[in-house]
Amino acid sequence: MIFHANPGVIDLGINIDHVATLRNARGTVYPDPIEAALQAEEAGADLITLHLREDRRHIRDADVRALRPQLATRMNLECAITQEMLDIACEIRPQDVCLVPERREEVTTEGGLDVAGRFGQVSSACKQLAAAGIRVSLFIDADADQIAAAAACGAPVIELHTGRYADAHTPDELAIEFRRVADGVDAGIRHGLVVNAGHGLHYTNVQPIAALAGIKELNIGHAVVAHAVFVGWQNAVREMKAIMVAARLGTRYPAAGKPA
């Protein structure tokens, strides 16, 4: 099988949040989101995205601090607009910070940031991050007013929320939501913004979004983590069995993954 990983065509940001979710579910130190990030880079990821939520439900402060100096690509840190999060971002200095809305009761980010309604707060956050040498992105709905507000508050990048497209239940609804995203891309470019997109994208719905020439980067996480369960599962089972058999026979099974 041939994988096309042409650099510069469209960037893939791998979100490692749900590797941390799996780790935290049992209170273990594995799977290690740092290792997941580094392996994603080896596999062709153009950047690593992670969301430090206020409740630390998946990614933890220590993850962000440990990962930042190890990345060969870019870190895209997602966070809410709180002074605590802005100060952490300015301390760690990822290449990119994507400001997102956040509610503790939500399972995942449910919508875009209301830049127009919170203009002063968003603008102030953009200035603080920019002063620390961090490129700022705003996670917003594909709405003309929000896109205009994002440009006005000084953010050079927007990430369009594709959740409504991903959750569409009928062909007509899908077409409407796709057009909304496509129009949002065009509007962002007219305002001189770099346009990224993400949320809810997976292996069978990403193609139309990725085909939009104006999109620079897609950030995808849960779908990749979920798919890895299946495409890597048989190898994981075989290796565990081989380790067990080797231990029973008193032979050595090297960490490289092949029996001695």
Swiss-Prot record:
GO cellular component labels: cytosol
GO BP field: pyridoxine biosynthetic process
Example GO molecular function: pyridoxine 5'-phosphate synthase activity
Catalytic activity: 3-amino-2-oxopropyl phosphate + 1-deoxy-D-xylulose 5-phosphate = pyridoxine 5'-phosphate + phosphate + 2 H2O + H(+)
Protein keywords: Cytoplasm, Pyridoxine biosynthesis, Transferase
Coiled-coil zones: none
Annotated site residues (Transition state stabilizer) in this chain: E159
Organism from which the protein derives: Cupriavidus pinatubonensis (strain JMP 134 / LMG 1197)
E.C. code: 2.6.99.2
Protein name: Pyridoxine 5'-phosphate synthase
Catalytic residue list: H51, E78, H199
Amino acids binding 1-deoxy-D-xylulose 5-phosphate: D17, H18, R53, H58, T108
Signal peptide stretch: none
Enzyme class: transferase
